[in-house]
Amino acid sequence: MNILELSEQEIIRRNSLNELRAMGIDPYPAAEYVTNAFSTDIKAEFKDEDEPRQVSVAGRIMSRRVMGKASFIELQDSKGRIQVYITRDDICPGEDKELYNSVFKRLLDLGDFVGIEGFVFRTQMGEISIHAKKLTVLAKSIKPLPIVKYKDGVAYDSFEDPELRYRQRYVDLVVNEGIKETFEKRATVVRTLRNALDEAGYTEVETPILQSIAGGASARPFITHHNSLDIDLYLRIATELYLKRLIVGGFEGVYEIGKNFRNEGMDRTHNPEFTCMELYVQYKDYNWMMSFTEKLLERICIAVNGSTETVVDGKTISFKAPYRRLPILDAIKEKTGYDLNGKSEEEIRQICKELKMEEIDDTMGKGKLIDEIFGEFCEGSYIQPTFITDYPVEMSPLTKMHRSKPGLTERFELMVNGKELANAYSELNDPLDQEERFKEQMRLADKGDDEAMIIDQDFLRALQYGMPPTSGIGIGIDRLVMLMTGQTTIQEVLFFPQMRPEKVIKKDPAAKYMELGIAEDWVPVIQKAGYNTVADMQDVNPQKLHQDICGINKKYKLELTNPSVNDVTEWINKLK
């Protein structure tokens, strides 16, 4: 890396790195460093009356106070932080005091990793600390961390910019309190979910991510190309159709927790790559699945929060069963006053116009129109967990017809905090009906609906061999974690959410500067001074530019021959 691309602190740290090596200290040792305690455990287990406990810990230096022959550092490990008391004569018991005077005081920085061996004690100020007897350099940080300071519970110099936090999650995790806890709770959500399904006797499976047909949901897929087979493939939008094949194959229940991909918009609750759990159980229906879902979410909420309640954006949400159950057409009538029962596509389209819905177009069929009405007027109203049930057949191409309500299906979506959390059916297992549903989807595709499903002939073949009555559900893990941790954006529960490309400062190539008579070695210097394109130099005062670039030459010890003010004036004149 060009030295001009480094900050002053980065240069100092790289020089320190070289000094450590010159002293024979490996700043990145390969050997295992054995630890026997974590910061939180040391504090929790300390008792004043006990014999001093000998510990070996390792972590990152987050703050330090150097006071001559004695110093304090704050060490951060994977569990928390603890104060370490370091004295020159303790870590340098012999005549050689280099480890303290040079290495610790001069060459180590905030962000560096060190190992500490010593004993636990309580300081005169009452803080449980480690009295260091040995210090080992474990990893040198050559880029300074943003240092967040706290006073009276208020954070200063915070690393708060969302774009920076999401791009540099590794920094966010180090410096911002509570971030790591969110992701530990995410792990608890997934672990509790998996344990519950395993205890129920269901089998965790893996199905293809690259699929020849993007089936199982109404969504726009990502497309890629397999060079060897010379075919287009799709990143899966759902696991449904493959999991149902396994039910045909004889499994009692199967589930998969994995990534799905949808080539659609990004917002506070949508990421194009997301984690979903899908479960299919034979001989069950959607009524059983509603009860099972209630028990499952109760258990997860207790595991994460210690109770059946969570708080999101100031709203207390209770996952204690039972949840309200409301047919979708009743919900629409309740919120809009319109009864859509028995209405044709054209009648519903007219209702959309009367409701002054602007996003409606001719490519939308009856199911899509109903979905749009529900999304605009109803969905956001359901804060407490609510099962929206009995969707029209046009909205549910993979769902069994309702046993007593003509034109409707045995489907529910679970709404929580105004968003869909889960989608479930009594699964359609009539192969002839399923084929007709697929054909209707193809008719919608011909009208321009780019979210219509494609016919999956192999899935139809599997159904023809016979699939038992089955209920299935898909639960969005990311949204579930948002609810359980009180987050209001999906980006806060994804380690690395999808981002727009990072903005890169436009810089002219060296050749453009050289056309003005500027030596190639001086181009990075001029750009370091802020003149990233030759046009940036057009109106600058020649003396200012001369002063800027000569100052950089001196500061960074580049040892270039300085141009004269006349030389700089000639460069600028050529631009006029």
Swiss-Prot record:
Manner of cofactor binding, per the entry note: Binds 3 Mg(2+) ions per subunit.
Cofactor: Mg(2+)
Keyword Ribosomal protein: no
SS bonds (residue pairs): none
EC code: 6.1.1.6
Chain positions recorded as Mg(2+) 2 binding sites: 420
Known catalytic reactions: tRNA(Lys) + L-lysine + ATP = L-lysyl-tRNA(Lys) + AMP + diphosphate
Cellular location(s): Cytoplasm
Biological process annotations from GO: lysyl-tRNA aminoacylation
One of the record's GO cellular component terms: cytosol
Pfam families: DUF4332 (PF14229), tRNA-synt_2 (PF00152), tRNA_anti-codon (PF01336)
Keywords annotated in UniProt: Aminoacyl-tRNA synthetase, ATP-binding, Cytoplasm, Ligase, Magnesium, Metal-binding, Nucleotide-binding, Protein biosynthesis
GO terms assigned for molecular function: ATP binding; lysine-tRNA ligase activity; magnesium ion binding; tRNA binding
Residues making up the signal peptide according to the UniProt record: none
Residues that, per the record, bind Mg(2+) 1: 413, 420
Stretches of the chain forming a coiled coil according to its record: none
CDD domains associated with the record: LysRS_core, LysRS_N
Domain of life: Bacteria
Family matches, as InterPro entries: Aa-tRNA-synt_II, aa-tRNA-synth_II, aa-tRNA-synth_II/BPL/LPL, DUF4332, Lys-tRNA-ligase_II, Lys-tRNA-ligase_II_N, Lys-tRNA-synth_II_C, NA-bd_OB-fold
Record family assignment: Belongs to the class-II aminoacyl-tRNA synthetase family.
Subunit organization: Homodimer.
Record protein name field: Lysine--tRNA ligase
Protein encoded by which gene: lysS
